[in-house]
Amino acid sequence: MEIVNKQSFQEVLEYVRMYRLKNRIKRDMEDNNRKIRDNQKRILLLDNLNQYIRDDMTIAEVRGIIESMRDDYESRVDDYTIRNAELSKQRREASTKMKEQKKAHAELLKNAEK
């Protein structure tokens, strides 16, 4: 019985660890979503700004700078999207492990009662 309790305690610790990991991943994904949204707003801002700037109003290099900034923001959006996909995969894996562990623990308790 003591072996079952020790194993059960270890499983509970592992379950808590997985639950915390899952929550951390969820927070990271929400943070990435905010970053994606912010950078998409910046892209829109730069697009609008680019419509108002005329060659006779300012130096042509300004357009190059704006385009460079826009490309940078688009790259960031892509990077965050990829990171979100990776985090989502980790979260699904953690959920699967937690379900398996919960099922195994239930079976262990069921067998211990016999």
Curated annotation (Swiss-Prot):
Q: What is stated as this protein's family in its record?
A: Belongs to the pole-localizer TmaR family.
Recorded hits in HAMAP family, A to Z, give: Pole_loc_TmaR
UniProt organism field: Haemophilus influenzae (strain 86-028NP)
Q: Which residues form a coiled coil?
A: 70-111
Q: Note whether Cytoplasm occurs among the keywords.
A: yes
Any idea where this protein resides? Cytoplasm
Q: State the gene name recorded for this protein.
A: tmaR
Region (Disordered) residue ranges read 89-114
Quote the NCBIfam families the UniProt record gives. Answer: PRK05423.1
The record describes the protein's role as: Pole-localizer protein involved in the regulation of several cellular processes.
The protein in question is named Pole-localizer protein TmaR
Q: InterPro entries given for it?
A: DUF496 (IPR007458)
Any Pfam family hit: DUF496
Taxonomically, which superkingdom? Bacteria
Q: Any one cellular component term from GO for this entry? A: cytosol
Give the record's keywords alphabetically.
Answer: Coiled coil, Cytoplasm
